[in-house]
Amino acid sequence: MLVKQLEVSAQTIRRDIIHLDEHSILKRHHGGIGINPGTKSLSYSSREIENVTAKKCIGAAIASKIPDGASIFIDIGTTMEPIAEALLNHSGLTIVTNHIGVALILSQNPDCTILISGGQLRSRDKAIIGESSIQFLSQNRVTFGIFGIGSIANDGQLLDYDYRDAQFSRYAMEASRTTFVA
């Protein structure tokens, strides 16, 4: 499933998972990966300042794959703002997001069109959630979708901490021609 979703080889996924496990970022187990059990459940603001250099590298890598003029969905999560910052110099982007922080960052680029889903603002992580945000997705198709995840199940299914976030991401992935997981 990940091979198809990420459009990379099984060897690439295996190598990346081994690297993440060796650096205690993820915990590898038979048939899948998950959150390192030694990892504390930190607040969003605490997670924002963790691994900043890695998040900027991820942002630069993803931004290098996005052409000018693309339509992009950007999910919620602490890696999404560095990705948005890496996209600031692109021109003609159309951004669809449920992340207020991403919208504010990309609003610095006057050549960027930003579409924000409606719904309830969840202040702890700057996310817009709710049924109206899911309905919003049915009206927008994008070339690229950029997603954050909580973990990966044994069967390769991408998981999140909140079922509403997982449901929203599932709809957004269906609306995206190409997906990136960050």
Locate predicted features.
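Short, flexible loop segments at the rims of nucleotide/cofactor-binding pockets, characterized by
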Residues: 48-52, 72-73, 93, 121-126, ...
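Conserved SAM/SAH-binding loop
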Residues: 80
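HTH-adjacent hinge/linker in prokaryotic transcriptional regulators
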Residues: 4-76, 84-90, 96, 100, ...
